[in-house]
Curated annotation (Swiss-Prot):
It holds the Pfam family NADAR. This is Uncharacterized protein F44E2.8. It comes from Caenorhabditis elegans. Residues 1-27 are annotated as: Disordered. It comes from the Eukaryota. Disulfide bonds: none annotated.
Length: 242
């Protein structure tokens, strides 16, 4: 069965005009207008998943078990965290502002609170946006893969739910993020899926900082969190069948 791969247009910066022009001006300004797309080299081991409405799982927000904001106890290196987001933000602060700042997050009970607290701490410490962005580019993927694996490996109910998604494409539908999410809401992303039925998404099997540039465009974003979840799913499946 031949399927045309999408999400790998000619290399370069690609403008997400179609969505931005349909949004209120305030929302359109909340995310980048361009997403970097680089063709996937043939020497990088890859996988391909068919695009179809029944082969996609959309997720967003603290009520969805796939979200980093979902309240869930995770133990990493002997330390307990209330969610993936708690660990992610703690790692960010540890590197950028030090151990004491990271420890302050223990007072933040919910993932939303921990995001706000981190933002305030970084602002008070006068950490420039460029430095925060550099941490994200260098460390965020490894941090997320590590904690997300622990999240599902330690919680049997969540692990079963993740494995039950089979080989479906997991897409974070958040309009304000074209890196970790699709840069679009569920309605728009669903329309994008409908337009690309009988095509496929080809992506690097191992999602690491060196090949994130090769991830295909999903709606208007890179959907990095979705691809990380799919890799964790593959790893858990392999361990379960071993």
């Amino acid at each position: 069965m031949n399927k045309k791969s999408v999400g790998q247009p000619p290399e370069g910066l690609h403008e997400t005009k179609s969505l931005a022009s349909a949004l209120p001006e305030k929302n359109a300004e909340q995310r980048p207008k361009y997403v970097q797309i680089v063709a996937l080299p043939s020497e990088i081991k890859s996988r391909e998943l068919p695009i179809a409405p029944d082969n996609v799982v959309y997720f967003n927000g603290p009520t969805h078990y796939l979200s980093a904001l979902y309240p869930c106890t995770v133990v990493v290196d002997g330390n307990e965290y209330n969610s993936v987001e708690h660990y992610y933000q703690a790692c960010k602060l540890y590197v950028l502002t030090g151990e004491q700042s990271a420890a302050q997050l223990k007072a933040s009970e919910t993932p939303i609170e921990v995001k706000k607290a981190t933002k305030n701490i970084l602002k008070e410490a006068k950490i420039p946006a460029k430095k925060i962005s550099a941490w994200k580019d260098k460390d965020s993927i490894a941090v997320l893969k590590h904690v997300i694996y622990h999240k599902f490996n330690q919680n049997d109910e969540l692990k079963v739910k993740l494995l039950d998604t089979g080989d479906k494409i997991l897409i974070q539908t958040y309009i304000g993020d074209t890196y970790f999410a699709a840069g679009a809401n569920a309605k728009y992303t669903s329309t994008w899926v409908d337009r690309h039925v009988n095509q496929s998404l080809k992506y690097p099997e191992n999602v690491v900082v060196d090949n994130v540039q090769y991830l295909p465009l999903v709606a208007n974003g890179k959907n990095v969190l979705g691809w990380i979840l799919m890799q964790v799913r593959d790893e858990l499946r392999m361990r379960s069948s071993a």
